[in-house]
Amino acid sequence: MGMRMMFTVFLLVVLATAVLPVTLDRASDGRNAAANAKTPRLIAPFIRDYCCHRGPCMVWCG
């Protein structure tokens, strides 16, 4: 396999790995809308209950 062919294969692999996550993110947003909406409700109590009672994190808890 020549250098030009190896470079072409390398570019194809890089482009495929760069494009695939973008298309997967767009496709998953519609299907996981309920999960995405529920996430802030789950994170806020965790931060309040777990992190606000620890010394280093209390700065962020107001």
UniProtKB/Swiss-Prot annotation:
Q: Kindly list the places in or outside the cell where this protein is found, as annotated in its UniProt entry.
A: Secreted
This protein's UniProt keywords:
Acetylcholine receptor inhibiting toxin, Amidation, Disulfide bond, Ion channel impairing toxin, Neurotoxin, Postsynaptic neurotoxin, Secreted, Signal, Toxin
Q: Tell me the organism.
A: Conus imperialis (Imperial cone)
Q: What is the lineage of its organism?
A: Eukaryota, Metazoa, Spiralia, Lophotrochozoa, Mollusca
- Do the record's keywords include RNA-binding? no
Family per UniProt? Belongs to the conotoxin A superfamily.
What does the protein in this record do?
A: Alpha-conotoxins act on postsynaptic membranes, they bind to the nicotinic acetylcholine receptors (nAChR) and thus inhibit them.
Recorded protein name is Alpha-conotoxin-like ImIIA
Q: Which GO terms describe its molecular function?
A: acetylcholine receptor inhibitor activity; ion channel regulator activity; toxin activity
Domain characteristics, as noted in the entry? The cysteine framework is I (CC-C-C). Alpha4/3 pattern.
Q: Give the signal peptide, or none.
A: 1-18
Please report the propeptide residues according to the UniProt annotation: 19-48
UniProt keyword Signal present: yes
| Subcellular location, principal | secreted
Positions modified as Cysteine amide?
C61
InterPro entries, sorted = Conotoxin_a-typ, Conotoxin_a-typ_CS
Q: Which tissue types show expression of this protein?
A: Expressed by the venom duct.
Q: Which GO terms describe its cellular component?
A: extracellular region; host cell postsynaptic membrane
Q: Which cysteines are joined by disulfide bonds?
A: C51-C57, C52-C61
